[in-house]
Amino acid sequence: MIKKYFVLISLFFFICCADDNIKSYELADQWPSLPNDFVLGNPTGIGVSSSNDIVVFHRGSRVWQTPMPTEKIKEKTILILDNKTGEIKNAWGSDLFIMPHGLEVDNEDNIWVTDVALHQVFKFNYTGDLLMVLGIPNQSGVDSFHFNLPTDVAVSPNGSFYVSDGYGNSRVVKFSRQGEYLFEWGKFGTDKGEFNIPHGLDLDKSGNVYVADRENNRIQKFDSLGGFISLWQNKSKGQLYSVNIDKSENYLLGIDYVINENFIPVGSDIFRFDLNLNLKTRFGRSGFYNGKSKRYHDIQVDNNGNIYTADIIDNSLQKFRPIIN
């Protein structure tokens, strides 16, 4: 018994120390491996399944435009990629969406997505069967039945979930597992607890909510009831697009996007924080890695610590492996 505990403690110590020694990442330059005739549209969302598959939400031939189009995308917009090879294992989602945006894979491998043109949130099982729809199609609003360009979803272990809503409404809304409206918080502004495009969000196991407050260039942390805890302000003036917590809850990842005074893209950075929002390292346009960095829209870390990014200028996916020093 003592030997068993010693092994477990040693393993825990090794994992913690290994994680503490991760200072940089290297690009997996042969990932993904897509068919030559396959055209990846704007990849707007990334998730990871329990089996470590990479799930991607992309726009096919659709490009962002205002006013929003009304026709649904003909291509399959949900891709299931092999974690190691980057090959497509499955694809579905044709004739379902107008303007794909956020994606979340919950702990039961259900796939949640938002469509900003439809003003809706969808829940599917892993093979594409529709399980739940929230919001009224093509109708925006600010009540408990409507969204206004919802951007992302985060699902808790008990099945309740949060929606960042979004481009049109500056709020975060919580729903029960069954999709019943529970409460919301936030309004447009720059004070603590206010938002200017809540663009992405994630949860830790304590129920705290981390929000990428895009146009305010910051990440805000709240408790499960929406009570403000802390924030991190991006001093490089980069818009914060997405956040993601690793499965072991050792760190939080974030991504930003910077344009200069002439509205020319400068690129994105990847940030790594502890869960108290203390910045530990960053890479991307700031250097220290060999990947491309144009406009990252989403970020995800898999069960092995590999980082994945979705770039909507390059229409590309990238994988970064951790380097243990």
Identify the function of each model-found stretch.
Residues Y5-F14:
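Sec-dependent N-terminal signal peptides
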Residues K4-Y5, I219:
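Hydrophobic alpha-helical segments, especially transmembrane helices
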Residues D19-N325:
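Eukaryotic scaffold repeat domains enriched in small/polar residues
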